[in-house]
Amino acid sequence: MKVTKKDMIYEGKGKKMWSVAEDENLLIAEFKDDLTAFNGIKKSSEKGKGALNNKISTQLFHLLEKNGIKTDLVETINDTEQVVKKVKIFPLEVIARNIATGSLTKRLGIKDGTVLPFTLVEFCYKDDDLGDPILNDDHALLLGAVKDKNELENLRQTAIKINKILKEFFATKNLKLVDFKIELGKDKDGNILLADEISPDSCRFWDAKTNEKLDKDRFRQSIGNVKVAYEEVLRRILS
């Protein structure tokens, strides 16, 4: 697919988004090597990380599409770039949790590593200045993040379905899918699509036998060998 970058319309922590000269309904997503944690307080860079996330996310989006999940991915065009559909992103981080760790254990006092009895779905308001606060359903409606309760429930059920597909897939790769956060959006026809990425930047993966962390927690917690961990996740996905 031949496309031409036009203007950079957005730069986030992990990606740059570019308009496409040939089609106003498409964008180019460029994966960066930057590493950030704690809402951008901790920063670094890992050469090759962007390319790894691009490859991992491409594989997982294809897997989800085969299982009935609509995504924004059109085509991966090189090591660090994808062509994606332009979508209007809901101002929500949608989080699905299978095992308690991270902020959940701090907020609720649940022991780290506790397997949850059901998929816990949480919504956070995307606002760095506010620290991405967690919302209940009424908060989401009050802020206009969704149009009604049915739309919010649609987001919740989409996250649950994505979790089921990924959790079962990673179990065959000797990986525990601990939790993940996703972004969902609407295309020009009003369809809800999975957007952004699914990668070790946005998921927690633990080795099924040792519970070794193979995700961005290696950066958050200064464990090291971030790129090696991401490479291992990709190797298992492709195996």
Swiss-Prot record:
EC number(s) per entry: 6.3.2.6
Family, as annotated: Belongs to the SAICAR synthetase family.
InterPro entries: SAICAR_synt/ADE2_N, SAICAR_synt_PurC, SAICAR_synth, SAICAR_synthetase, SAICAR_synthetase_CS
SUPFAM superfamilies associated with the record: SAICAR synthase-like
Pfam family, one: SAICAR_synt
Keywords: ATP-binding, Ligase, Nucleotide-binding, Purine biosynthesis
Name of the protein described by the UniProt record: Phosphoribosylaminoimidazole-succinocarboxamide synthase
Organism listed in the record: Campylobacter hominis (strain ATCC BAA-381 / DSM 21671 / CCUG 45161 / LMG 19568 / NCTC 13146 / CH001A)
Catalysed transformations (reactions): 5-amino-1-(5-phospho-D-ribosyl)imidazole-4-carboxylate + L-aspartate + ATP = (2S)-2-[5-amino-1-(5-phospho-beta-D-ribosyl)imidazole-4-carboxamido]succinate + ADP + phosphate + 2 H(+)
Keyword Nucleotide-binding (UniProt): yes
Pathway terms, separated by semicolons: Purine metabolism; IMP biosynthesis via de novo pathway; 5-amino-1-(5-phospho-D-ribosyl)imidazole-4-carboxamide from 5-amino-1-(5-phospho-D-ribosyl)imidazole-4-carboxylate: step 1/2
A GO BP entry: 'de novo' IMP biosynthetic process
Molecular function per GO: ATP binding; phosphoribosylaminoimidazolesuccinocarboxamide synthase activity
Keyword set includes Nucleotide-binding: yes
Highest taxon above the source species: Bacteria
